[in-house]
Amino acid sequence: MAFAAAATSTIRLATGILILPQRNPLIAAKEIASLDRISGGRLDLGIGVGWLREEFDALGVPFEARGARTDEYLAALRVLWSESEAEFHGEFVDFDPVYCQPKPAQQRIPILVGGHSNRAAQRAGELGDVFFPAERPVETLLSLHSLAKEFAEKAGRDPAKIELWTSSNGDSSHLDQLVEAGVSQVMVPARPPEQLAERYAQLIADYDLEDA
């Protein structure tokens, strides 16, 4: 991503996704802020709690507490990025006043919360800026987004500011359904090179982008 940041000037960059509870939050804060700084404030931070127990076992991180750990790490990151001398005392991360540099270029790095459970919807509503479930039936996406906005309102946040992103195979009819459902951004997963030219040529034709 650092290479992509250096080689571009306008596209936004996003992690999709960073398994946050597997990271040291103080180191992650510096790495993420550095990337946002060198990109000129173009980073969206996609995070998730993880699902593969063996990864957590290999790292010595308790699998069962990954959700609570993620929530606390998010709170710690916000403190490290916003305070000149940051201090945080929690169950999973605890540090006395420290200086954490560099600070992000953006005043607030957008947090994309991945997942498709009710708990993920709650995390997005309470702590995130974007809810980013993987491709699901449109009705499921609408239900999850509604739940995320409910949790945002309960947390004293503006529910209208919780965006909904998802992924798609790029089928034009599916994309139209997502737009109608209020999805603001769609990720079309990468494919083998031999498939890309044909697929994107079809998308260009479907959306009349030849002269765009």
Model-inferred region functions:
Residues 1-212:
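Active-site-adjacent structural elements that line small-molecule/cofactor binding pockets in enzymes
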